[in-house]
Amino acid sequence: MHKHRTPEGLAEHATIDRAVLELMLDLDRQRPWAEDEIARTLSVPGDVRESLRRLRACKLIHRWNDLAVAAHAAVRFHEITQPTDGLSPSDTSERHWDKAVLEGLLARSTDGEGPRTAQQTYEAFGATKQKKRLQIHDALDRLEGAGLIERRSGRSIASEVARRLDELMTL
């Protein structure tokens, strides 16, 4: 296996990185994982140590000596993109707006477009009523708090962490 990444990354790297991240994001097993434990659990070929190094460099995990755990942004991204079965109506609504706003900003960034103002976001969703605007504004605040978007001077853009998560989780 190659030790150096190409600018686009290797398919083998993306496969093991995704497998390691999915293991850490599994709702039933979210806890710190030892490097050896990850290697024993995964059936995907590849270098777990290098995968953990790449994931840490992308700020998708945290490391303490031999232990690794998914970063808050990765956990929140995973929560947002999961089905909403069994959630309360208010949680379902929150998740809907979080997902819609994040997908809009990710699509914009994939197309090479720059940041979007709050007004442009409202217009993109056809938010003419105050209630809808507040829901979008709250979603922007939650996404910023989770580290999935960056906001400066009233403009929002998907963070590098969110772009990398989107790239990894949609192979």
Predicted feature descriptions by range:
Residues 29-42, 111-125:
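Short acidic, hydrophobic short linear motifs in intrinsically disordered regions
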Residues 10-17, 66-86, 154-171:
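Short, cationic-aromatic polyanion-contact patches
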Residues 56-66, 144-154:
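A short, conserved structural fragment
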Residues 43-57, 128-145:
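Short amphipathic alpha-helical interaction segments
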Residues 13-14, 31-32, 45, 94-95, ...:
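Alpha-helix N-cap/helix-initiation sites
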